[in-house]
Amino acid sequence: MLAKRIIPCLDVRDGQVVKGVQFRNHEIIGDIVPLAKRYADEGADELVFYDITASSDGRVVDKSWVARVAEVIDIPFCVAGGIRSIDDAAKILSFGADKISINSPALADPTLITRLADRFGVQCIVVGIDTWFDDATGKYHVNQYTGDENRTRVTQWETLDWVQEVQQRGAGEIVLNMMNQDGVRNGYDLTQLKKVRDVCRVPLIASGGAGTMEHFLEAFRDADVDGALAASVFHKQIINIGELKAYLAGQGVEIRIC
């Protein structure tokens, strides 16, 4: 059995780490490189960086901080933000990133997933999915350009359909960003995770809602996700990664202990 992964998420805007609630009202958390090093030292299995306005601004993630992060950490990290071509991805990987993640650009051009997977290998290609539960329809819908609340829009895709589509096109991993739960800290949406897990054959990462150590346990035990991503509980030092891993190991979760 592969060890479950604990993954801090760092949303980047204007060169700093920020955090919002339900993808809105972002506050500044701090500088990118010191936070990355802190999480690596605490025992994170990998890091994910989202340049949250790159896609909506029509630009690619700023590569300068990617190189600086690579210099100070020795764990894998994934970078997302406006990657629209093989050349964009190649440059980010050349600066030291281990994986690249695409989200809004994949919705705009689904063939991008296949082209990137063919060029760099599926293990390198992550697809992020921003999913929102609509009370009116009772369905989960995929959203696009969520880094800018003024440009966010609901797409034609229902979440489960898009999960299956991106797998067929070559996604090597899926990060499910559950927008209703984002920053609220009342637990991951286990109902949605179970539905996605039923149709997801590649590694599945839960994102959105972690507030306690028990929430991580529930995601691993009840929804069988491969990794749990969180931001505010780590940024605000509500949960220490080393202590979280010790707790999970004590509950029988296969986890890498530093």
From Swiss-Prot:
Keyword Cytoplasm: yes
One Gene Ontology biological process: L-histidine biosynthetic process
Pathway per the UniProt entry: Amino-acid biosynthesis; L-histidine biosynthesis; L-histidine from 5-phospho-alpha-D-ribose 1-diphosphate: step 5/9
Pfam families for this protein: His_biosynth
Alphabetized UniProt keyword annotations: Amino-acid biosynthesis, Cytoplasm, Histidine biosynthesis, Lyase
EC assignment: 4.3.2.10
Chemical reaction(s) catalysed: 5-[(5-phospho-1-deoxy-D-ribulos-1-ylimino)methylamino]-1-(5-phospho-beta-D-ribosyl)imidazole-4-carboxamide + L-glutamine = D-erythro-1-(imidazol-4-yl)glycerol 3-phosphate + 5-amino-1-(5-phospho-beta-D-ribosyl)imidazole-4-carboxamide + L-glutamate + H(+)
UniProt-listed InterPro entries: Aldolase_TIM, His_biosynth, HisF, IGPS_HisA/HisF, RibuloseP-bd_barrel
Keyword tRNA processing: no
CDD domains the record matches: HisF
GO molecular function: imidazoleglycerol-phosphate synthase activity; lyase activity
Domain of life: Bacteria
Covalent S-S links between cysteines: none
Entry annotation: catalytic residues: D11, D130
One Gene Ontology cellular component: cytoplasm
Location of the protein in the cell: Cytoplasm
Record's function text: IGPS catalyzes the conversion of PRFAR and glutamine to IGP, AICAR and glutamate. The HisF subunit catalyzes the cyclization activity that produces IGP and AICAR from PRFAR using the ammonia provided by the HisH subunit.
Family indicated by similarity: Belongs to the HisA/HisF family.
HAMAP family: HisF
Subunit annotation: Heterodimer of HisH and HisF.
Protein name per its UniProtKB record: Imidazole glycerol phosphate synthase subunit HisF
Organism: Salmonella typhimurium (strain LT2 / SGSC1412 / ATCC 700720)
